[in-house]
């Protein structure tokens, strides 16, 4: 699952880095919008639940319901991956980094950049929160878990080489391990 589009076309529109005398004064393109929408791997998916796992914080978690998901990370990659897995309609809120057109009408549950607003999260009645420590604070994640919301903390370290593995882990969390391989 991933973005379809032409990276080469996008880079031709950007100025060369050395053409700006003071990078802090640079204005203009700040959001690349020419990428095409993410296409799901299937029109309809059937998550295989429950999923039992140990999250990155060492908590044993059982995921029973993926009908109302909040996927929170600094890059917005969790929402993009869930969209690619066919679960876009299950996403009920977003961070400021989740800029996909299909999510723009969803409420933002972070403030001041990437600080989780616990009240905003709980007001959406999520059945599953997927988060990593690229946003926080940690106390906010603990409060969401203490409120009884199934919360899975993922490993925040990502590299270009780990993309496939990261998507596979996320697919495993939501009961779609086979779809995550596509």
Language-model-detected regions and their locations in the chain:
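Bacterial Sec-exported substrate-binding components of ABC uptake systems
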Residues: 1-77, 178-182
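Extracellular/periplasmic catalytic domains that process cell-envelope and extracellular macromolecules
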Residues: 45, 62-64, 122-123, 144-146
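Soluble periplasmic/extracytoplasmic beta-strand elements of cell-envelope proteins
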Residues: 52, 62, 70, 92, ...
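A short, structured surface patch at a secondary-structure boundary
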Residues: 68-124, 128-134
């Amino acid at each position: 699952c991933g973005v379809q589009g032409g990276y080469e076309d996008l880079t031709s529109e950007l100025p060369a880095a050395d053409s700006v005398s003071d990078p802090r004064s640079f204005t203009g393109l700040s959001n690349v919008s020419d990428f095409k929408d993410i296409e799901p791997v299937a029109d309809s998916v059937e998550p295989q639940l429950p999923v039992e796992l140990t999250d990155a914080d060492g908590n044993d978690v059982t995921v029973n319901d993926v009908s109302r998901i909040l996927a929170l990370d600094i890059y917005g990659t969790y929402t993009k991956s869930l969209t690619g897995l066919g679960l876009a309609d299950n996403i009920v809120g977003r961070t400021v980094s989740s800029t996909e057109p299909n999510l723009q009408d969803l409420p933002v549950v972070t403030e001041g950049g990437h600080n989780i607003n616990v009240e905003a999260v709980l007001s959406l009645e999520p059945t599953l929160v997927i988060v990593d420590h690229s946003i926080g604070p940690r106390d906010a994640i603990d409060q969401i878990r203490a409120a009884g919301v199934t919360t899975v903390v993922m490993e925040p370290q990502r590299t270009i080489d780990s993309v496939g593995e990261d998507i596979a882990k996320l697919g495993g969390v939501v009961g779609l391990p086979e779809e995550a391989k596509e």
